[in-house]
Amino acid sequence: MSRIGKLPVDIPEKVDVSVNDNLVTVKGPKGELTKEFNNKKVTVEVKDGQVLVRRVHDKDKDARAFQGLTRSLIDSMVEGVTNGFEKKLEMVGVGYNAKKKGKDLELEVGYSHPVIIEAEDGIEFDVEKNNKIVVRGIDKQQVGEMAAKVRAVRKPEPYKGKGIRYEGEHIRRKEGKTG
């Protein structure tokens, strides 16, 4: 039995969840998210202020996995429209700077030109102290992808530790050549 999948998702007071066939729409104070679940192995229903995800066939192993996945995605949608999500990144290196230009993010990370990252719909960048970047949004997956895109501009290198890293991320350091 899927332990996560059998738990109901509680719907807070200010959040409205509606299910039409395979389309789940979650509206809340921060915005609206819609996701399509094309899996015929699970059903989604709203009952008594809770979202229930049920399997169509109890013996199916794939259905157990999809039940847990679907429940987790719906829980993230509810969390996103109530509180939102954020990922923090920090820049380590001499002369590494970040600036906000309108909605977009401009990074100076040792290249001959500044790198501009355009904010997608639903994503907001904040810059603190020129070297800390905060990526905010209501869609957990989209926030994670944008943070990964920012990090990919200059990944942390193992010799000096320079680059863009997630806050609290530990970079394994290597010894340089001796001799």
Swiss-Prot record:
PROSITE patterns in the record: RIBOSOMAL_L6_1
SUPFAM superfamilies reported in the protein's UniProt record: Ribosomal protein L6
Any GO molecular function: structural constituent of ribosome
InterPro entries: Ribosomal_uL6-like, Ribosomal_uL6-like_a/b-dom_sf, Ribosomal_uL6_a/b-dom, Ribosomal_uL6_bac-type, Ribosomal_uL6_CS
One Pfam family of this chain: Ribosomal_L6
GO terms, biological process: cytoplasmic translation
Matches recorded under Gene3D superfamilies: Ribosomal protein L6, alpha-beta domain
Keywords: Ribonucleoprotein, Ribosomal protein, RNA-binding, rRNA-binding
Entry GO CC: cytosolic large ribosomal subunit
Stored NCBIfam families: L6_bact
Family (UniProt): Belongs to the universal ribosomal protein uL6 family.
Quaternary structure and interacting proteins, as annotated: Part of the 50S ribosomal subunit.
Role summary: This protein binds to the 23S rRNA, and is important in its secondary structure. It is located near the subunit interface in the base of the L7/L12 stalk, and near the tRNA binding site of the peptidyltransferase center.
Protein name: Large ribosomal subunit protein uL6
